[in-house]
Amino acid sequence: KKGKKNMASSLMHYAITDKILQLFPMHDGARLRFGAVLPDASVNKRKTHFRVYSEKLGIRLYDLEAYRAQFGKRMQKDDLYLGYYLHLIEDALYRKTLYDTFGWNPYTPESTARMHHDYTLLNRHFIQKYNIRDDLAVPENFTQEPIFAFEPFDAEGLLRSIHQNFVPAPADAPY
């Protein structure tokens, strides 16, 4: 699965955002949730995740300052843009934990395949444990949003992919 080998699953972003909304109600929770999964709705993940290469460190980093420079004012007024920013922070923390704390190597096919299998198992667990609803929707007039001009996201495709997590597993599935 090209482009998803080192990020938390979209459903995990949804679950985290749902929990945040329970603790800190926002003006528009639906837009916050949608924004929190939006960076994964593109094949150009480096661009949508504001990833830049650091010569000094020899790795790609999340350029949160670039996101704030481009969308910071909107982020203060529009929960979609705040949700998008939350996604970037979650991914940065996830990578730091996975790589630095646990020493995970994303460059082997075995570890990537194992992680995607784990996502499948965890996604179903999160749906049940946190009572996650299959209610994400593309906001009205989304294609008119400045963020859509930044990258023409395949939001409908992402929602179809997330929806697949809610389809019951076959009876013979191990989990």
Regions found by a protein language model. Name each.
Residues 2-175:
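N-terminal leader/auxiliary helical segments
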